[in-house]
Regions:
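N-terminal (or domain-start) structured segment
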Residues: 31-124, 161-163, 169, 182-211, ...
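Hinge/capping helix and adjacent helix->loop/strand transition within the periplasmic-binding protein
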Residues: 91-97, 112-197, 246, 251, ...
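N-terminal export leaders
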Residues: 7-17
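An extracytoplasmic/periplasmic, membrane-proximal ligand-sensing/linker region
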Residues: 38-40, 222, 269-332
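A ligand-binding cleft/hinge motif common to bilobed small-molecule-binding domains
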Residues: 105-116, 178-183, 209-242, 320
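Beta->alpha turn/N-cap motifs
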Residues: 101-106, 166, 195, 212-217, ...
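Bacterial N-terminal signal peptides
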Residues: 16-25
Length: 332
């Protein structure tokens, strides 16, 4: 009996000692957040240099670094439609020093086209905030003379098969084409390995038209090499004000590609709040706004990190259904 009492007292003492240490253990993240940031931050992009994600990262990194008082270094980790870079961030130490700049494809679309995705994005990332929006552009090349609007394109599809190129399988341009196919089935998706070949073949008349993120098509449209029949944003974009929205022909047809910042899921909320504040300051800078506009991106932020987290989860569910219904699978 004495041994039992001694053992019980020892256990209680150990428990009391553990409870006494709890405030210290809990204070570590808070202290780290108080001192954040104290060293350079890596901003990972899941694509090679020169694409829309990379351009956005290099636009925002200097302003973000200035707001935080440390260097923000862009790091390209390309592959698997951005998933390789995203996975690297998801598995990084959640201390705010390794962040992901991502559009909708790497953490909404591409993982849902994989048989065994390496992460579940709504769970494995914590949103910081959105920084910009850009629509898809629906444009036609020289093969479709007389087609000036999306209504014209859909009418032409009643009489003949229409081929629309994109930068590859499973991206937002491809899924936009799948939504058009639901309206008019006589549309064929022609995937290419990248924006460059898709644009070249559309200009050369090998396909009828193209659906792509606006930035790679912007100059071709401005120089009238391609005819934009619609942008898929809710409202017309300022830098192509004469191009109608898809909703003007198809009410409710709204497809926007966002660009935003994310951290690993267990990053302290206090660190997320500091990053959100710094991002807001950077995006509000006139120079950043001008650079985004020149890249055919519209500065855009949500009310809070939590609001962007919900937008991410909602988009994941919405596009997951489109991917499943279309039977889209990543093949390379």
């Amino acid at each position: 009996m004495q041994n039992h009492r001694t053992s019980r007292r020892s256990a209680l003492r150990r428990l009391a000692a553990s409870l006494a240490l709890l405030p210290l253990a809990m204070a570590v993240p808070a202290k780290a957040a108080d001192n954040f940031p104290s060293k350079p931050i890596r901003l990972v992009v899941g694509y090679p240099p020169g694409g829309s994600n990379d351009i956005a990262a290099r636009i925002i990194a200097p302003g973000l670094g200035q707001a935080l008082g440390v260097s923000v270094v862009v790091e390209n980790r390309a592959g698997a439609s951005g998933v390789i870079g995203a996975d690297h961030v998801a598995k990084s130490v959640p201390d705010g020093y390794t962040l992901l700049l991502s559009s909708i494809s790497p953490i909404v679309l591409a993982p849902q086209t994989m048989k065994a995705p390496p992460f579940y994005a709504p769970r494995d990332f914590k949103a910081i905030n959105m920084m910009a929006l850009t629509p898809e552009a629906i444009a036609v090349g020289p093969r479709l003379t007389g087609v000036k609007t999306l209504k014209d394109l859909l009418e032409r599809a009643k009489r003949q098969q229409i081929t629309l190129s994109s930068s590859g399988t499973g991206g937002l341009p491809h899924l936009t084409i799948e939504l058009l196919r639901k309206v008019r089935g006589n549309i064929v998706h022609v995937p290419y390995k990248g924006a460059g070949p898709a644009v070249t073949d559309t200009l050369g008349g090998h396909v009828d038209g193209i659906v792509m993120d606006l930035p790679p098509l912007y100059n071709q449209i401005k120089e009238k090499r391609l005819t934009a029949v619609a942008v898929t944003s809710e409202k017309r974009v300022d830098f192509l004000a004469d191009v109608p929205t898809a909703q003007e022909a198809l009410p409710g047809f709204n497809v926007e590609n966002w660009v935003g910042l994310f951290a690993p899921s267990n990053t302290p909320n206090a660190v997320i709040a500091k990053l959100d504040q710094a991002l807001r300051k950077a995006v509000s800078e006139p120079q950043v706004k001008a650079l985004l506009a020149n890249a055919a991106m519209a500065p855009a932020m949500m009310d809070s990190p939590q609001a962007f987290q919900k937008r991410h989860a909602d988009d994941y569910a919405r596009w997951g259904k489109v991917i499943k219904d279309a039977g889209v699978e990543m093949t390379d």
